[in-house]
């Protein structure tokens, strides 16, 4: 394999994290098994191409020598005459179309599912939607929702996530119960905005202030993101979070450099202003002394004339 034991263990741990989160990156587990993501975020194809070819089949050029076009059905057939499930389904579809044109009855399905099963599944789904809607109303959100409306499944699922008693929001509130800023951020994420009073030390003009998600600090948002990733450790989201952290670190370092340069320029300007002000004050005193000397000289000349 040409890989060290540590890299193999890291890959296994990543697969385990993906399985425990019940999420498989599109297009699914086959893609995860075949495509290996390196640490720098690039896809690597080492042994995976060979495995894919082995599972998928032979080379496309070789496939043309194994199949031929049926002149009657205009579909591909194996040259050796062997048939599989696809051939059976294709033939069954043609027979059903022909029988319908002739007015014959359709063939019975291979597996027959009783109608009672579908009715029971439908009733259970309605019951689940009703229970979710009741919990949604009990939480004080959306009292005008019709409990008989079956189109509220998406709303109910979102409610489960943002429920005050259970769900991700409740877990995050318990985790950051000592952090007021993140608690306000969670409220803004849940309701779109949060209103803060001057009691919380936010406003200085004795007025309320409305904060949106973008008004919170980047450090708090990234801290909350890391906490969510601990609950849902998917490789794709981890990679995106690492990129956000890297970009934030770069921007933060650049801003610190710019602030240091600005402070240095301010200090230089203040120093120059002090020097210029001291020069101006010195020249002003000298001018006053010169005027006084001129007055004294004039008085002396007048005294001489009078004498």
From Swiss-Prot:
<dbReference type="GO" id="GO:1990976">
    <property type="term" value="P:protein transport along microtubule to mitotic spindle pole body"/>
</dbReference>
<dbReference type="GO" id="GO:0042729">
    <property type="term" value="C:DASH complex"/>
</dbReference>
<comment type="function">
    <text>Component of the DASH complex that connects microtubules with kinetochores and couples microtubule depolymerisation to chromosome movement; it is involved in retrieving kinetochores to the spindle poles before their re-orientation on the spindle in early mitosis and allows microtubule depolymerization to pull chromosomes apart and resist detachment during anaphase.</text>
</comment>
<keyword id="KW-0132">Cell division</keyword>
<comment type="subunit">
    <text>Component of the DASH complex consisting of ASK1, DAD1, DAD2, DAD3, DAD4, DAM1, DUO1, HSK3, SPC19 and SPC34, with a stoichiometry of one copy of each subunit per complex. Multiple DASH complexes oligomerize to form a ring that encircles spindle microtubules and organizes the rod-like NDC80 complexes of the outer kinetochore. DASH complex oligomerization strengthens microtubule attachments. On cytoplasmic microtubules, DASH complexes appear to form patches instead of rings.</text>
</comment>
<dbReference type="GO" id="GO:0051987">
    <property type="term" value="P:positive regulation of attachment of spindle microtubules to kinetochore"/>
</dbReference>
<keyword id="KW-0158">Chromosome</keyword>
<feature type="coiled-coil region">
    <location>
        <begin position="234"/>
        <end position="307"/>
    </location>
</feature>
<keyword id="KW-0206">Cytoskeleton</keyword>
<keyword id="KW-0175">Coiled coil</keyword>
<dbReference type="GO" id="GO:0008608">
    <property type="term" value="P:attachment of spindle microtubules to kinetochore"/>
</dbReference>
<keyword id="KW-0963">Cytoplasm</keyword>
<keyword id="KW-0995">Kinetochore</keyword>
<dbReference type="GO" id="GO:0051010">
    <property type="term" value="F:microtubule plus-end binding"/>
</dbReference>
<dbReference type="Pfam" id="PF08657">
    <property type="entry name" value="DASH_Spc34"/>
</dbReference>
<keyword id="KW-0498">Mitosis</keyword>
<keyword id="KW-0539">Nucleus</keyword>
<dbReference type="GO" id="GO:1990758">
    <property type="term" value="P:mitotic sister chromatid biorientation"/>
</dbReference>
<keyword id="KW-0493">Microtubule</keyword>
<dbReference type="GO" id="GO:0051301">
    <property type="term" value="P:cell division"/>
</dbReference>
<keyword id="KW-0137">Centromere</keyword>
<keyword id="KW-0131">Cell cycle</keyword>
<dbReference type="InterPro" id="IPR013966">
    <property type="entry name" value="Spc34"/>
</dbReference>
<dbReference type="GO" id="GO:0005737">
    <property type="term" value="C:cytoplasm"/>
</dbReference>
<keyword id="KW-0159">Chromosome partition</keyword>
<dbReference type="GO" id="GO:0031116">
    <property type="term" value="P:positive regulation of microtubule polymerization"/>
</dbReference>
<protein>
    <recommendedName>
        <fullName>DASH complex subunit SPC34</fullName>
    </recommendedName>
</protein>
<dbReference type="GO" id="GO:0005876">
    <property type="term" value="C:spindle microtubule"/>
</dbReference>
<comment type="similarity">
    <text>Belongs to the DASH complex SPC34 family.</text>
</comment>
């Amino acid at each position: 394999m040409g890989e060290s034991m540590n890299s193999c263990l890291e890959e296994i741990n990543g697969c385990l994290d993906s399985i425990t989160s019940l999420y498989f990156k599109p297009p699914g587990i086959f893609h995860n098994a075949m495509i290996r993501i390196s640490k720098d975020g690039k896809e690597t194809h080492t042994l995976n191409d060979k495995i894919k070819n082995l599972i998928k089949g032979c080379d496309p050029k070789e496939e043309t020598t194994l199949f031929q076009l049926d002149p009657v059905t205009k579909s591909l057939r194996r040259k050796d005459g062997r048939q599989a499930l696809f051939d059976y389904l294709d033939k069954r579809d043609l027979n059903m179309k022909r029988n319908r044109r002739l007015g014959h009855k359709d063939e019975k399905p291979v597996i027959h599912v009783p109608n009672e099963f579908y009715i029971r599944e439908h009733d259970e789904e309605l019951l689940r939607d009703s229970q979710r809607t009741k919990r949604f109303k009990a939480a004080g959100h959306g009292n005008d929702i019709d409990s008989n409306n079956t189109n509220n499944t998406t709303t109910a699922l979102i409610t489960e996530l943002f429920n005050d008693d259970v769900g991700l929001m409740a877990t995050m509130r318990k985790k950051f119960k000592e952090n007021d800023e993140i608690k306000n951020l969670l409220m803004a994420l849940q309701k779109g905005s949060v209103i803060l009073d001057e009691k919380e030390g936010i406003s200085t003009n004795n007025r309320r202030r409305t904060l949106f998600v973008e008004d919170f600090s980047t450090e708090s948002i990234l801290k909350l993101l890391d906490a969510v990733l601990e609950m849902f450790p998917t490789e794709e989201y981890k990679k995106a979070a690492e990129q956000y952290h890297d970009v934030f670190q770069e921007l933060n370092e650049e801003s610190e450099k710019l602030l240091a340069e600005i402070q240095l320029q301010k200090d230089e300007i203040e120093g120059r202003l002090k020097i210029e002000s001291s020069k101006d004050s010195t020249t002003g005193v000298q001018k006053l002394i010169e005027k006084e000397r001129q007055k004294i000289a004039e008085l002396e000349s007048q005294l001489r004339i009078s004498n």
